[in-house]
């Protein structure tokens, strides 16, 4: 195989790029990302884009800084711009890999946004896809979870995974041909991580198979199955679009409403997918909830009303007519922030501050129950407000503007004690997940 030709063909799958596109490539120093960097550089000879190499120093291992410097030195030799981004933390406990992945995407996409870069290219290769398939299978994933996605958005940045049919072995061979050495991350071979356990499981599975059934053949068969699943998902997507248009409303105040009667007519897969997207949008998440958790809240299992469940940073409330999904802060309430154009509150609401003179020190916060008595009469006199037709509890998830700890504005219900605020400060709902299927009321 000619890996450079195959890679250029893969890049065509993502559609046409704009003239002289700005591209970022996530490169750790491992074989996958270094090979990706060289392949993109070759492809870019025709595209004439502007490439920036981004390396994350996680500060979890003593070698991490020298590894970032190694990537920088390679970039200098091949004349590519390189930037090291640092994950600043006070020590990590719990699921280190999950937290590192979340921080990594946050740092990468933040940089892309700040430098007007739309495309972020990452080294997710065929072996990763196969391992993810088994990991999700072990967790009981549904159709959407088992299918593979090589193009998606995080924080309005286009994530591209062009190595989807290229194996790790082929990437290493390519680096050897280019006389480039790579770094081996010891965590990739540690049995305390599920991915390593799955990798070993795949190898052990072959022992009981016929002698001519190789690891590579197994990977190809699994990828073929994933392709069929992805095709099946496309047919479900048409159903999803239909029900999103006719059954779902997402309000710019950050909550969603589903027509319960019509939603019952959707297939289970469509219901699970729609609920998953809504929970990510409302709950400020970039990753979907577990399939088993979705089953708990599906209409297939819950027929009663005047009840609620909590999941994925959301409260899912059931009335006779509707399913209402709104934010649950739990134990982690959003912090109070000074109003300015750089603020994104609760990872969902972007502040628009058009004040020419910021002499009034305003803060953005959530509505506390102790604040409610100050606006109770206004709320009760505005019962016709569409938001109050569903659940008054939603009010306590809206962003409010305070001055000296007093609520002076709740823009989403048009409450203002100061007209100058009404004319100058507002919020725009910008959730982490952006989907072509949803629009906001």
From Swiss-Prot:
GO biological process: tRNA modification
InterPro entries reported in the protein's UniProt record: Rossmann-like_a/b/a_fold, TilS/TtcA_N, tRNA_Ile_lys_synt, tRNA_Ile_lys_synt_N
Gene Ontology molecular functions: ATP binding; tRNA(Ile)-lysidine synthase activity
Predominant location: cytoplasm
Keywords: ATP-binding, Cytoplasm, Ligase, Nucleotide-binding, tRNA processing
Regions annotated as coiled coil: none
Pfam families from the UniProt entry: ATP_bind_3
Record keyword Transcription present: no
Any single Gene Ontology cellular-component annotation: cytoplasm
Record PANTHER family: TRNA(ILE)-LYSIDINE SYNTHASE-RELATED
Family: Belongs to the tRNA(Ile)-lysidine synthase family.
NCBIfam families named in the record: lysidine_TilS_N
Protein name: tRNA(Ile)-lysidine synthase
């Amino acid at each position: 195989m000619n890996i450079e030709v195959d890679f250029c063909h893969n890049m065509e799958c993502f559609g046409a790029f704009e003239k002289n596109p700005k591209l970022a490539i996530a490169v750790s120093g491992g074989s996958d990302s270094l090979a990706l960097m060289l392949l993109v550089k070759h492809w870019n000879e025709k595209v004439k884009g502007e490439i920036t190499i981004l390396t994350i120093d996680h500060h979890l291992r003593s070698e991490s800084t020298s590894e970032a410097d190694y990537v920088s030195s390679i970039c200098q030799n091949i004349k590519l711009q390189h930037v090291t981004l640092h994950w600043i933390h006070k020590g990590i406990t719990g699921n280190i890999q999950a937290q590192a992945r979340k921080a990594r995407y946050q740092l990468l996409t933040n940089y892309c946004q700040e430098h007007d870069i739309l495309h972020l290219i990452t080294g997710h290769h065929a072996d990763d896809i196969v391992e993810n398939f088994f990991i999700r299978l072990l967790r009981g994933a549904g159709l959407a979870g088992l299918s593979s996605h090589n193009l998606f958005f995080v924080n309005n940045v286009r994530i591209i995974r062009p190595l989807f049919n290229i194996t790790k072995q082929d990437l290493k061979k390519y680096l050897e041909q280019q006389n480039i050495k790579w770094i081996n991350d010891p965590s990739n071979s540690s049995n305390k991580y599920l991915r390593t356990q799955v990798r070993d499981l795949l190898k052990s599975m072959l022992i009981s198979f016929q002698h001519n059934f190789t690891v590579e053949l197994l990977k190809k068969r699994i990828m073929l199955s994933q392709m069929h699943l992805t095709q099946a998902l496309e047919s479900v997507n048409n159903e999803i679009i239909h029900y999103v248009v006719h059954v779902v409303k997402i309000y710019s105040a950050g909550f969603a409403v589903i027509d319960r009667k019509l939603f019952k007519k959707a297939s289970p897969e469509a219901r699970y997918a729609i609920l998953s997207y809504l929970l990510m949008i409302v709950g400020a998440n970039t990753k979907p909830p577990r399939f088993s958790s979705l089953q708990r809240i599906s209409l297939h299992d819950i027929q009663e009303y005047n009840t609620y469940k909590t999941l994925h940073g959301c409260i899912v409330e059931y009335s006779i007519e509707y399913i209402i999904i709104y934010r649950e802060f739990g134990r982690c309430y959003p912090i109070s922030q000074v109003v300015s154009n750089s603020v994104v509150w609760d990872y969902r609401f972007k502040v628009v501050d058009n004040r020419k003179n910021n002499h009034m020190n305003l803060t953005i916060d959530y509505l506390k129950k102790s604040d409610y008595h100050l606006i109770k009469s206004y709320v009760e006199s505005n019962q016709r407000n569409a938001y109050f037709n569903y659940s008054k509890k939603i009010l306590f998830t809206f962003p409010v503007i305070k001055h000296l700890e007093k609520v002076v504005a709740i823009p989403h219900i048009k409450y203002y004690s100061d007209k100058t605020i009404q004319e100058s400060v507002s919020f725009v709902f910008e959730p982490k997940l952006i989907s072509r299927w949803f629009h906001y009321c």
